[in-house]
């Protein structure tokens, strides 16, 4: 008799199961439950403004200039002269229209309120040590440089702004009306710097205009630099007396403007009576990013955000209010985003005894196996020992590396978009550095959609890569098992030996050696001879005789039936002779 011994177990590749699924969005599959996620967004809360980490942050233009507005510093008010520290980031903290505590200025006739903002846009700012024009000998002179009691100096004597010289005709001979005169404004800063030149003109009542300049008619003024030309006509009379910062009341007004001269470029000013000629100029270089905020600056932060203040970046993206931000900032997106950090969610697969082997294999592909500690992909063994599970850490690490690569790619996308957002702001450093909100919002919406699509595609790739990892596991398993197992499909192999938890752990660790496990012995035929005993026929012998007789009878009957069939078909003739 032949006896065959089977010790076969079945080993399959598989994916872990989880009882706490999360949901991610994908490009083609919609929302998919996965075993883990990496949140990519946060919703910040409002905080105070802070110094930007890793760089100098400028609050007031001149921190040591007490009781001075930034416009006072920018115009060179006598009591507000000081050093402006260098900075790569600046806070636009004066949100209301700001005046200067000196001679009354008609701020709304020019862009002069933007001058402090312009200066904030530079990293390095210094006031020249000498004057750009000799005001006393300028065309239309000689002049005396006028001062005012409403603009006291540090000794409380009469003074005036350091950036301008009030050119008053020196004697009665030149206190007359004049045709437009032109003066060149040379570039006196260092090569590579921008020169910001401040100038203006004085207007007063008809009586005062005649007294100071010999002409009561409106005067014309023009400035030109870098292809930008600006025209003004003075307004005569009709001003109520006004005092600034406790100074003497004044019936007159001054109009102040500025021009930006690029390195080596000359500017021109065409004027009549009442000119405020340029004197000391601002020399500026480098770029400092400007953002609206508030003082004081408390502590440090990764990012400064107009709506939320100082933020420390914990996620690459944020939801909530969109606004301008500078520094190492998250990018605004419309909806929360999550990156898949695991496998597609599968409920625990049913055991063999519940579904049968092939049913369990199908369930294994549809479901997952519990017990793969610290791993997403691995192996299961089915046999007399029950079900053993072991995680394959290498394939799990490869999956994690792919997710990390996706995360880094999204971070690179974030940096590029951040540069794109701030780039336009840098290019407008000669202006107030504010973009139209509608244009900015449209740009933000576009970038948000790009980022959301990138995350959807990343999730799609991560989830779809499960098949790739399982196929790699299957090839690895097949190579390790070698001739000790038979491939039965669906990522499963039937082994010719037992494979318990120890065996499975070695497979997962890549140290499996089939020779260490006992292979089964196959006896192709085990024949036991029958023998006659002295006691006569035993049961085995009787059974043998019975079998022989029954077989002979069956053969005889079959032959007889065949002959009868052939005769009936006339294929065989039968002759009987006596």
UniProtKB/Swiss-Prot annotation:
Membrane topology: Single-pass type I membrane protein
Pfam family, one: Hemagglutinin
GO biological process terms on file: endocytosis involved in viral entry into host cell; fusion of virus membrane with host endosome membrane; fusion of virus membrane with host plasma membrane; virion attachment to host cell
Compartments where found: Virion membrane; Host apical cell membrane
Lipid-modified residues, S-palmitoyl cysteine kind: 574, 577
DNA-binding keyword on record: no
UniProt site positions, description: Cleavage: 355-356
Record-linked InterPro entries: Capsid_hemagglutn, Hemagglutn_HA1_a/b_dom_sf, Hemagglutn_influenz_A/B, Hemagglutn_influenz_B
Disulfide bonds: 12-492, 68-80, 102-151, 499-503
Lineage top rank: taxon: Viruses
UniProt keyword annotation of Zinc present: no
Miscellaneous notes: Major glycoprotein, comprises over 80% of the envelope proteins present in virus particle. The extent of infection into host organism is determined by HA. Influenza viruses bud from the apical surface of polarized epithelial cells (e.g. bronchial epithelial cells) into lumen of lungs and are therefore usually pneumotropic. The reason is that HA is cleaved by tryptase clara which is restricted to lungs. However, HAs of H5 and H7 pantropic avian viruses subtypes can be cleaved by furin and subtilisin-type enzymes, allowing the virus to grow in other organs than lungs.
Family: Belongs to the influenza viruses hemagglutinin family.
Known partners and oligomeric status: Homotrimer of disulfide-linked HA1-HA2.
The protein's name: Hemagglutinin
Species of provenance: Influenza B virus (strain B/Victoria/3/1985)
Taxon lineage: Viruses, Riboviria, Orthornavirae, Negarnaviricota, Polyploviricotina
């Amino acid at each position: 008799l032949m006896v065959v011994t089977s010790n076969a177990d079945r080993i399959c590749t598989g994916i872990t199961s989880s009882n706490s699924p999360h949901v991610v969005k994908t490009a083609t599959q919609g929302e998919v439950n996965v075993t883990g996620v990496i949140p990519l967004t946060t919703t910040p809360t409002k905080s105070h403004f802070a110094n930007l980490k890793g760089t100098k942050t400028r609050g007031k233009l001149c921190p040591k200039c007490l009781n001075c507005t930034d416009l006072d510093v920018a115009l060179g008010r006598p009591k507000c002269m000081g050093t402006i520290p260098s900075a790569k980031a600046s806070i636009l903290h004066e949100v209301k229209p700001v005046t200067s505590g000196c001679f009354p200025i008609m701020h709304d006739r020019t862009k002069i309120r933007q001058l402090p903002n312009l200066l904030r846009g530079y990293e390095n700012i210094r006031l020249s040590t000498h004057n750009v024009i000799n005001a006393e000998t300028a065309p239309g002179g000689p002049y005396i440089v006028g001062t005012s009691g409403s603009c006291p100096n540090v000794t409380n004597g009469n003074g005036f702004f350091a950036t301008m010289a009030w050119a008053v005709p020196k004697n009665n001979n030149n206190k007359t009306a004049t045709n437009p005169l032109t003066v060149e404004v040379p570039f006196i800063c260092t090569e590579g710097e921008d020169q910001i030149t401040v100038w203006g003109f004085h207007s007063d009542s008809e009586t005062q205009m005649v007294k100071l300049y010999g002409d009561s008619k409106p005067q014309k003024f023009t400035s030109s630099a870098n292809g930008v030309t600006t025209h003004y006509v003075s307004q005569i009379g009709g001003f109520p007396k006004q005092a600034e910062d406790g100074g003497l009341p004044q019936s007159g007004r001054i109009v102040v403007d500025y021009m930006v001269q690029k390195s080596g470029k000359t500017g021109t000013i065409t004027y009549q009576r009442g000119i405020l000629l340029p004197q000391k100029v601002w020399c500026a270089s480098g770029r400092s990013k400007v953002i609206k905020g508030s003082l004081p600056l408390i502590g440090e932060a990764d990012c400064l955000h107009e709506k939320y203040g100082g933020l420390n970046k914990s996620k690459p993206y944020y939801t909530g209010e969109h606004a301008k931000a500078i520094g190492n900032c998250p990018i605004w997106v419309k909806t929360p985003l999550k990156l898949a950090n695991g496998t597609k969610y599968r409920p625990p697969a049913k055991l063999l005894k519940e579904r049968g082997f092939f049913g369990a294999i199908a369930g294994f592909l549809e479901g997952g196996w519990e017990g793969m500690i610290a791993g997403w992909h691995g192996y299961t063994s089915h046999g007399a020992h029950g079900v053993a599970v072991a995680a394959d850490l290498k394939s799990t690490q490869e999956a994690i590396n792919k997710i990390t690569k996706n995360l880094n790619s999204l971070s690179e996308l974030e940096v590029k978009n951040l540069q794109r957002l701030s780039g336009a702001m840098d290019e407008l450093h000669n202006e107030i550095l504010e973009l139209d909100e509608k244009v900015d919002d449209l740009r933000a919406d576009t970038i948000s959609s790009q980022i959301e699509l990138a995350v959807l595609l990343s999730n799609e790739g991560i989830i779809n890569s499960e098949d790739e990892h399982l196929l790699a596991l299957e090839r690895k398993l097949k190579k390790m098992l070698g001739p000790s197992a038979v491939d039965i499909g669906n990522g499963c192999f039937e082994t010719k030996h037992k494979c318990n938890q120890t065996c499975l752990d070695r497979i997962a660790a890549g140290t499996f050696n089939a020779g260490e496990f006992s292979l089964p012995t196959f006896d192709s035929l085990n024949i036991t001879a029958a023998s006659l005993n002295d006691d006569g026929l035993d049961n085995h012998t009787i059974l043998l005789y019975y079998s022989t007789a029954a077989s002979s009878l069956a053969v005889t009957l079959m032959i007889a039936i065949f002959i009868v069939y052939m005769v009936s078909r006339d294929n065989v003739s039968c002759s009987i002779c006596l």
